[in-house]
């Protein structure tokens, strides 16, 4: 871990949400240098599930070598914020560092998020950060080591981070936008930065979100405390940065990050908002964004007669040069389409449409019978034999992948049933011995229902309804996402992080199922 250097001795650090978790860890790290800590948090009485109050935190800070000032602060209340700032200045003579750590979270989609919860997240995350910063800035400007640090993510506009928890993302990005604006506004006077973990951090909030056993996939709060300490040591010129904890600690010479793991060597859960796990992120993006749009574009070329009957598409020589396709607004507005050059080449190299079996893996496309008939692609070579003779082989039927049998046109229930059939065929006594778990799947949406996968009974069992033995893990998701997950198009980790998959029960056994899925993907 990062050693203390005494750099913060005598500095006053104002931390919101410092009674427990990450806020308290940062406070204790600074206290070891002899810093003055203002504990700005709500909790004054012990909670049966949430350990720690502003007073117990003050005792720990004093024991670590710092001086503590516990203040009752709800960051939604501007008067409480201003009162705490006044007390801090009166007690310690000023404020040198502000840590905006207080946060509210609800990983629910738009229709499932009550207005009251939306207001809470906006008020605590965005408004609370803004008001606390505003109250502290006049005093920070007088400090020689002035820092504002927001616990917020990089501004990543990948739609996957908005889709399943739009309100939370907006509220959290509001904190990040404070960094973006204030860093420039107070450049040369105050260093303003954001800090975000690469992996999940074990806190009370994570226990509530992930359930029992999630801690083994997390790192300790110490990694955030060390990263924050590294930032505080830097000059005011170090500003406007969106910092990942692991990256800045690597700069400090930390190489072994197992020291921060709750369970060293155990796979870690990636945190939200980071596209730093390319395989997982691309699988997730394909599961709802670029691939469906690509397929819709192709289906329009095949199914909408007006596109094929337009004489300019057949007669204009520009078709071979494809300026129109490159200039179409809808293609340019979709960055993911620009990343797939084969989309521009497909009118000349139509066989690529058949080389992408994943197009048939999407249930919504198979529900359109036109895709099976495909009369238009057979007519195109006849209409333009001189321009594209290479298209003549296109109508020849291609071998269908095994997934075609998993995804019948209708209904989704059939896809789920067929998926379980193939899963059953993939089981063995060896798999059962290695897993020893019963999984229950609560599938929502069209033709949803309850299914189970029993990997405790000899040979393994699958079926519709609840298992005979109590399930060790209950997974809730949409039927469509279930099929994608078992066919390898959607990784369980990313489904969980994006809110598509909800897990109750033993997380370690859920991870075992993910490994089993990887093994079965070759058959699915």
From Swiss-Prot:
SUPFAM superfamilies: NAD(P)-binding Rossmann-fold domains, SCP-like. This is Hydroxysteroid dehydrogenase-like protein 2. NADP(+) binds at residues 17-23, 42, 74, 172. Residues 283-410 are annotated as: Disordered. It comes from the Eukaryota. Residues 301-391 have a biased composition (Low complexity). InterPro entries: HSDL2, NAD(P)-bd_dom_sf, SCP2_sterol-bd_dom, SCP2_sterol-bd_dom_sf, SDR_fam. Residues 414-521 form the SCP2 domain. The gene is Hsdl2. The active site is at 168 (proton acceptor). The keyword RNA-binding does not apply. Has apparently no steroid dehydrogenase activity. Controls bile acid (BA) and lipid metabolism in response to nutritional cues. Keywords: Acetylation, Hydroxylation, Mitochondrion, NADP, Oxidoreductase, Peroxisome. One of its GO terms (cellular component) is mitochondrion. The keyword tRNA-binding does not apply. Belongs to the short-chain dehydrogenases/reductases (SDR) family.
């Amino acid at each position: 871990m990062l050693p203390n250097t005494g750099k913060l001795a005598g500095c006053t650090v104002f931390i919101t949400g410092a009674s427990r978790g990450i806020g308290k860890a940062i406070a204790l790290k600074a206290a070891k240098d002899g810093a003055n800590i203002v504990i700005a948090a709500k909790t004054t009485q012990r909670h049966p599930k949430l350990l720690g109050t502003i007073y117990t935190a003050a005792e720990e800070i004093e024991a670590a070598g710092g001086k503590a000032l516990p203040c009752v602060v709800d960051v939604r209340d501007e008067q409480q914020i201003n009162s705490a700032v006044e007390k801090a200045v009166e007690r310690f003579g000023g404020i040198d560092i502000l840590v905006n750590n207080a946060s509210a979270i609800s990983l629910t989609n738009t229709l499932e998020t009550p207005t009251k919860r939306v207001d809470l997240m906006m008020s605590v995350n965005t408004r609370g950060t803004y008001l606390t910063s505003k109250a502290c800035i006049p005093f920070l400007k007088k400090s020689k080591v002035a820092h504002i640090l927001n616990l917020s993510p990089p501004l990543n506009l990948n739609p996957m981070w908005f889709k399943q928890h739009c309100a939370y993302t907006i509220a959290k990005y509001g904190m990040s936008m404070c960094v973006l604006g204030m860093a420039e506004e107070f450049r040369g006077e105050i260093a303003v930065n954001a800090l975000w973990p690469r992996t999940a951090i074990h806190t009370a909030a994570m226990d509530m979100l992930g359930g029992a056993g999630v801690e083994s996939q997390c790192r300790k709060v110490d990694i955030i405390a060390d990263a924050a300490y590294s930032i505080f040591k830097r000059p005011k010129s170090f500003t406007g940065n969106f910092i990942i904890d692991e990256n800045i600690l690597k700069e400090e010479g930390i190489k072994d990050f197992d020291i921060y793991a709750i369970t060293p060597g155990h796979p870690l859960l990636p945190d939200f908002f980071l596209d730093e796990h390319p395989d997982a992120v691309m699988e997730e993006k394909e599961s709802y964004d670029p691939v469906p749009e690509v397929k819709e574009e192709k289906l329009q070329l095949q199914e909408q007669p007006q596109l094929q009957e337009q004489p300019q598409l057949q007669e204009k020589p520009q078709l071979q040069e494809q300026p129109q396709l490159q200039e179409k607004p809808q293609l340019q507005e979709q960055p993911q389409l620009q990343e797939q050059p084969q989309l521009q080449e497909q009118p000349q190299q139509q066989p690529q449409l058949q080389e992408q079996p994943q197009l048939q893996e999407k249930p919504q496309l198979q529900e359109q019978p036109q895709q099976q008939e495909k009369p238009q692609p057979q007519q195109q070579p006849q209409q333009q034999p001189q321009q594209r003779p290479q298209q003549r082989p296109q109508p020849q039927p291609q071998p269908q992948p095994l997934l075609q049998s998993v995804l019948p046109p209708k209904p989704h229930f059939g896809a789920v049933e067929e998926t379980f059939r193939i899963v059953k065929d993939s089981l063995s006594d060896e798999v059962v011995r290695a897993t020893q778990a019963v999984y229950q799947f609560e599938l929502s949406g069209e033709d949803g229902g309850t299914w189970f996968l029993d990997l405790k009974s000899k040979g393994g069992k699958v079926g519709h309804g609840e298992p005979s033995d109590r399930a060790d893990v209950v997974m809730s998701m949409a039927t469509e996402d279930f099929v994608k997950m078992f066919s390898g198009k959607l990784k369980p980790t990313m489904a969980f992080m994006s809110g598509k998959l909800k897990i109750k029960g033993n997380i370690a056994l859920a991870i075992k199922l993910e490994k089993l899925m990887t093994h079965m993907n070759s058959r699915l």
